[in-house]
């Protein structure tokens, strides 16, 4: 998110899933790309909604090829990626839904009533140094959870806070 802002873009959160990403690109001509944390990326300019890692790699190399080569003053490939933040995050954690989906999500949302959050795709809670996401799966009777911190200590702190708020209603032992 911060790299998008630093590059002059405007990040927008939408629901997880290919169909939602494709719809976002179709309905927003100013959006040059869409992506998911799972690694799926969609470039708008030539084939909107086309998600192929080989194609995206070729396009990335094409874009990099427009800049001067390192021996002509351009940055090395490794230098380009060194500018990208490398924040620790949990794996995607799947927790079986016990009880109703709406009731469980309402309980989770209430547990974070004092926090800044987004409900575009489940509940994404903002922390000063990271975030926590809890969303119902689109395809299974489970909750999908993730967390990210600026460093390992902040990630641990976020997980501990989440556990203190909802650990009594959900088994969060896999969220690490």
Predicted regions and their residues:
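Phosphate-binding and adjacent anionic-ligand microenvironments
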Residues: 1-146, 152-176
